[in-house]
Amino acid sequence: MKKFTKIIALALAIVLTFALAACSNNGGDDAKNEVIKIAVPNDTTNEARALLLLQEAGIIKLKDGAGITATKNDIVENPYNVEIVEAEAAAIPSLLPDVSYAVINSNYAINAGLNPVKDSLFKEGSSSAYANILAVKSGNENSDAVKALKAALESKKVADFINEKYAGSVVSTVDNPTDGFDSSVDYAALKGTTISVAASPTPHAEILEIAKQILAEKDITLDIQTYNDYVVPNTVVEDGTCTANYFQHTPYLDDFNAQQNTHIVSVASIHVEPMGLYGGTQKTLDAVSGK
């Protein structure tokens, strides 16, 4: 009887050992095959920009010819089995705990307390195609108010502020900064007037505060209206509520005009915000680098 009991105990131990080994192996396979989720902006131009960044990082490959209008349907190679999660650009930083990685615009990264230079795992170069612009309604490009605002934003004072404040996470695109004033503008006629501009809080509204100081020297008030979305800043320019806006790049504006039948044009390129790939549940790029 004792011998029989020992045999049963030994058999149970062997079965348990194999069961634990099987569970361990399955867990390893599950971890190895876990889908990597990457959040990207859901608007047309920023999603394409994010996908191009992921391609540059070697994470995916897009079909030939896919450019600034690329979508996730243009992915032809996906060696790491990544799942693209589309979300509102402004909301992406809040998704970091729930995704493996996220591609975030620098302004939203900064607003969320992230440092695009130190915290991003991979970031794009300073592509002029995505420079942030000062935009106005077509027909107003040559008004003194617009030229005065443009001159203030193209000043050395603004360029120096950008370089010192953001240390590479925002880069000035003004080639020849000026004293902030345009000799063709009748500043005396603008004295006592208000120029309204719609902007994103960070860094646009912060940069505009420097332009505001310059305009104040001519007794011109700059009314900075901040918005957290990508739609209202254009609609308030189209309907005349605001003189100008400062929050977007040209590819986004072109797409917006085409989709909304608006008539907004760029009058100046001010800065570029390199888009970055940030870690969520994954803190390194090992999961998408074959390591």
Located regions from the model:
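Ligand-binding "clamshell"
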Residues: D98, N111-K123, D255-V267, Q282
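A bilobed periplasmic-binding-protein/Venus flytrap-type ligand-binding module shared by bacterial periplasmic
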Residues: Y130-A148, P274-V288
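Beta->alpha turn/N-cap motifs
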Residues: E88-A89, P97-S100, I104-I110, P201-T202, ...
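Short helix-initiation/N-cap motifs at beta->coil->alpha
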Residues: A66-S94, I224-T235
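Short, well-ordered beta-strand elements
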Residues: E34-A39, L190-T202, I220-T226, K291
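Periplasmic-binding protein-like
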Residues: A50-L51, Q55, A145, L153-V174
